[in-house]
Regions:
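Individual transmembrane alpha-helices with interfacial aromatic-anchor signatures
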Residues: 133-149
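Interfacial helix-start motif at the membrane-water boundary
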Residues: 57-75
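Alpha-helical transmembrane segments of multi-pass membrane proteins
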Residues: 33-47
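Haloarchaeal acidic low-complexity proteome signature biased toward cell-envelope/secretome components but also
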Residues: 1-31, 92-98, 105, 156-167
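Hydrophobic alpha-helical transmembrane segments of integral membrane proteins
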Residues: 102-126
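Membrane-helix interface/capping segments
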Residues: 78-95
Length: 167
């Protein structure tokens, strides 16, 4: 096994730390984006959180469970967003808040169609939800909510990753 030089080890450690920090930024951006999305949901269809999202965990009708689950999902999908953008080929998508918000918008729409439109109805059927939505379940409000999520996710993530470190 070849020994690695101290500078090479240092670069590896710094690279790993940068990835860990970006993933944390992804979680924070995902959480803030989910809060923004949740406001949009609350203004248009609060029952989505109370019934459908809570129903994923067998707690249909429990707004607190729906709210917590939604926040956790949003943070986890924020980490996934950060993980994807950690790839060197995609890293330039975080150069500016506008470019990253656009990337986030596309990401949010993909989550709407795949996650909420396909996976969620299947998951609800598996856990015995009373009346799971038809497949695929893609509505204008669903797309709009996830667009809010994606734009906020991308904008916040770009801001966090491009801000100078604090002393």
């Amino acid at each position: 096994m070849a020994e690695r030089s101290v500078p090479a080890l240092r670069r590896t450690a710094v690279g790993r730390l940068a990835v860990q920090i970006r993933w944390r930024y992804g979680a924070v951006a995902g959480l803030l984006a989910t809060l923004a999305m949740s406001v949009a949901i609350a203004l248009t269809d609060l029952e989505t959180l109370r019934v459908a999202v809570a129903g994923l965990y067998g707690s249909e009708g429990n707004l607190l469970v729906g709210w917590i689950a939604h926040l956790l999902h949003g943070a986890l999908f924020g980490v996934l967003f950060a993980a994807v953008l950690t790839d060197a080929a995609l890293e330039d998508l975080t150069d500016s808040p506008a470019k990253c918000a656009g990337t986030g918008a596309v990401y949010g729409l993909v989550l709407a169609v795949v996650g909420a439109g396909i996976v969620m109805p299947i998951w609800l059927a598996v856990v015995g939800f009373g009346a799971p939505p038809s497949l695929p379940h893609v509505t204008i409000p669903l797309l709009a909510w996830h667009l809010v999520y994606g734009v906020v996710l991308g904008g916040v993530f770009a801001h966090l990753t491009n801000s100078p470190p604090r002393a």
